[in-house]
Amino acid sequence: MSTASAASSSSSSSAGEMIEAPSQVLNFEEIDYKEIEVEEVVGRGAFGVVCKAKWRAKDVAIKQIESESERKAFIVELRQLSRVNHPNIVKLYGACLNPVCLVMEYAEGGSLYNVLHGAEPLPYYTAAHAMSWCLQCSQGVAYLHSMQPKALIHRDLKPPNLLLVAGGTVLKICDFGTACDIQTHMTNNKGSAAWMAPEVFEGSNYSEKCDVFSWGIILWEVITRRKPFDEIGGPAFRIMWAVHNGTRPPLIKNLPKPIESLMTRCWSKDPSQRPSMEEIVKIMTHLMRYFPGADEPLQYPCQYSDEGQSNSATSTGSFMDITSTNTSNKSDTNMEQVPATNDTIKRLESKLLKNQAKQQSESGRLSLGASRGSSVESLPPTSEGKRMSADMSEIEARIAATTGNGQPRRRSIQDLTVTGTDPGQVSSRSSSPSVRMITTSGPTSEKPARSHPWTPDDSTDTNGSDNSIPMAYLTLDHQLQPLAPCPNSKESMAVFEQHCKMAQEYMKVQTEIALLLQRKQELVAELDQDEKDQQNTSRLVQEHKKLLDENKSLSTYYQQCKKQLEVIRSQQQKRQGTS
């Protein structure tokens, strides 16, 4: 095995200039590309094409850059992967210098994104799998955040960058092309809008807490098996604008309170209010006691159809209700209960039993830390007025019930409860807004629940950023993004700045167009209603005119009859007088 430096060749020396610490030597095994037998292309990563290949009689994944513009991401990933060694982070075997590529661990299970939203048939997974994936992800990220001498933040946590191995039971984090040292001043914003923390696209001042925000979105996604903000659609800046204004994914009906509390804390607008990854690992480790079976391989429909289970991964036999929230301190909140199909998480076999308050066994008591640095084990029992520090009796469910022979019974998340709770207000039940439940009947709709704005007490972040999104243009389509300039050329920098301003103006115009189109639809709807009202008014006017004509005709007839009556009476009086 030979050890090479990233500055040992012409290609790597130019890349080495991009590394923040030139004195840092990247130690990795230099692999001869002739030893690699490429089999097929399996996708794209943070940079370049990802191929499945054979190397020394084992399956590997190779990432090869396609252009010089991807060299920086290549060096970033090479540098970061050469520093890490964790069971939940993809392993780097080595690198080739000609052509430039990484040789990495191959994940036969594909990405978590494909498991959740890929092509049919989709695999069946349990709540235990979902919780285990999130726990493993948090363990890997916590490792990155605790690295010395410089911690790492991933910046692009999302299901496409989470790979599965061992039958879908083991999760590994990949794609470090956007990762950076935590002490680095970040001037470029990369990542995906649906999972991106608001401070990432609002400016360059952000910390490891941006990974916590992304993790909270992933937790929601694996529980609901729905794409976050999928109902917003359109360009990425629409999602970013919604998140900037406080929109979050809808809460989940009957989600156990400790999970809901953890998830909503991760979504906090203020990064300092989010838990650390270390705290998340502690909480998730305790919660995993109530979700047995995470070590069982994923099953595809063809694997369990013979056992009397559903043959379709899109079966609507189980549901998870999502409740959309729009929390405000100034007014009560209306919450709409929207049924949402969940193809993977089955109903519990029976109602989950409420834990007894006096139960003191290890499996019966769980307290969640109300503060970021508190220890889960040392927390006192909770009071009725608290939600942030809750034992399992408040979940109103015994996740791990036992059968008659004492063996734990397989359980999964049933209908999950929900309360409209702001992450800034979850410490007290008294702060929960009023709830208006709308129950729907009939077949459930496949349309995702709408996300609603989430307005915390403090609408500004800790960095004091205003309502502008100066770096948001980085999520435009690739062909519209400003090309990286040559730092040594004033003309190149001037063109880059001009392009940035034009891209920013383009985004503003696109936003205005979207808002105007929305307003147009509202006006069209109002016009239709006005036309209907006008038609009704016209009909009423005609009826009124007709009634007036009838009234006039009747009045005339009445006068005629009255005159005839007077004539008849006068004639009768004359006859009586003559007689």
From Swiss-Prot:
A cellular-component GO term for this protein: cytoplasm
Cross-link (Glycyl lysine isopeptide (Lys-Gly) (interchain with G-Cter in ubiquitin)): 72, 158, 209
Database matches in CDD domains: STKc_TAK1
GO terms (BP aspect): apoptotic process; I-kappaB phosphorylation; immune response; JNK cascade; positive regulation of canonical NF-kappaB signal transduction; positive regulation of JUN kinase activity
Residue pairs linked by disulfide bridges in the UniProt entry: none
One GO MF term attached to the UniProt entry: enzyme binding
Biased composition (Polar residues): 306-322, 416-425
Cofactor(s), names only, from the UniProt record: Mg(2+)
EC numbers, comma separated: 2.7.11.25
Stretches of the chain forming a coiled coil according to its record: none
Subunit structure: Can form homodimer. Binds both upstream activators and downstream substrates in multimolecular complexes. Interacts with TAB1/MAP3K7IP1, TAB2/MAP3K7IP2 and TAB3/MAP3K7IP3. Identified in the TRIKA2 complex composed of MAP3K7/TAK1, TAB1/MAP3K7IP1 and TAB2/MAP3K7IP2. Interacts with PPM1L and PPM1B/PP2CB. Interaction with PP2A and PPP6C leads to its repressed activity. Interacts with TRAF6 and TAB1/MAP3K7IP1; during IL-1 signaling. Interacts with TAOK1 and TAOK2; interaction with TAOK2 interferes with MAP3K7 interaction with IKKA, thus preventing NF-kappa-B activation.
Purpose of the protein: Serine/threonine kinase which acts as an essential component of the MAP kinase signal transduction pathway. Plays an important role in the cascades of cellular responses evoked by changes in the environment. Mediates signal transduction of TRAF6, various cytokines including interleukin-1 (IL-1), transforming growth factor-beta (TGFB), TGFB-related factors like BMP2 and BMP4, toll-like receptors (TLR), tumor necrosis factor receptor CD40 and B-cell receptor (BCR).
The protein's name in its UniProt record: Mitogen-activated protein kinase kinase kinase 7
Organism of provenance: Bos taurus (Bovine)
